[in-house]
Amino acid sequence: RHRTLISETLWDESRGIFANRQRRGGFVRSLSPTSFYPLLCGAATPAQAARLLEHLSDETTFGGDFVLPNATRDDPAFADNVYWRGRIWPNVNYMVWLGLRRYGFTAEASKLAGQSYDLFMKNWREDRIASENYNAVTGEALDQGDTDPFYIWAAMLPLMATGEIVEFDLWTGWTVRNTGRDLALGPMLSPSGTLH
């Protein structure tokens, strides 16, 4: 029921994206990567999911060398480059990556994982930091004062890249990917029996 409400109520057909609603019913103009979260919970129809993908590579919204900005690149808030206004957040990228994988968008998920890894490594190699958030234009972490240079969720950026090679989930077990055929070990056993 909730997924249906999300699909029917928050889908903005004219823009081809999920968006928040104003109190009077209209769609909020500003967008963020949370527009992709309906993929995570399985609320997007196949047609909606396909249209969402267009925004991942669109450099006026979420696309670019450093992704995913927390305000679209064409939003005036993006230029602020302050906290949730245009910065890249590792936890948000991770959630979008999970949603892409859930819908079988493996190429798009792999691209996001690679870009996220590159963003992390740029700052790790240059400054040995694992930052709270990042500039969506330059990829820099410490270009403004309210960013913590060491924050645990920074590890989600390379975790996505690792998940493209070796993955574990409670329901299906281990999956090891390579250039050949995937190796799957599972289902997993727990003290209560097999996990399904």
Please report, for each region that a protein language model flagged, where it lies by residue.
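C-terminal capping/lid segments that line or modulate ligand- or cofactor-binding pockets
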Residues: 14-60, 76, 82-190
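Short amphipathic alpha-helical coiled-coil/interface segments
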Residues: 1-10, 113-116
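N-terminal start-of-chain detector that recognizes signal peptides
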Residues: 9-11, 68-69
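An acidic, gly/pro-interrupted, aromatic-rich
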Residues: 66-75, 80
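Non-catalytic terminal regions with compositionally biased, polar/charged low complexity
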Residues: 195-196
